[in-house]
Amino acid sequence: MLVFVHGGYWRSLDKADHSFIAPAFVAAGAAVVVPNYALCPAVSVEHIVLQMVAALVWVHRHAREFGGDPARITVVGHSAGAHLAAMLLSCRWRQVASDLPAHLVGGAMGISGLYDMEPLRLAPYLQTDLRLTVAAVRRLSPAYFPRPGPKFYALVGLDESDEFLRHNQLIRDAWGPTTVPVCETLPGRNHFTILRGLAEPGARQHDLALRLLGLA
């Protein structure tokens, strides 16, 4: 099962903007889920993380109803969604519910992700909506977490900003090459065209997602 988590700096966009992700993966044999989440400033980033945890629990428990395998859940996220994908990979699922597997998420891929929240706390145009505290930054930054067991693939476009390029390398440095065996910069892709490539069979990001799904 593929769960795709959209971006938008935790404060904009909607699952309806990202339905284009599904057809190519369905054609390859995957069941696809594109969940929504509430947006800042109406809720906090921490609340969004908890919403996504609840969404993944639901996916795990209902996967077979949609032809999916609850033991083969892959999460892919873009931008803020990549942050959420990394948070879900790091989740201690047995503390969420005793009947859940330790590795509910079997693998994840972050596209143009944000893994250290401190620079965002210091950006006034974002902090107005995100309202991050120093303590929240520590709780919400995957780059500060112990490396998870399952694999994480990190991708960014060569034509993205230096900060997105830095974050992509940061998660490899933090979690190491065993956990992050793929850390790549894709030529000819910016923050938006790299996402479109996820839905394009033959594109690197699409092929890597299929690998995580066990379909390549």
Map each language-model feature to its residues:
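Alpha/beta-hydrolase superfamily serine-hydrolase fold, recognizing
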Residues: 1-216
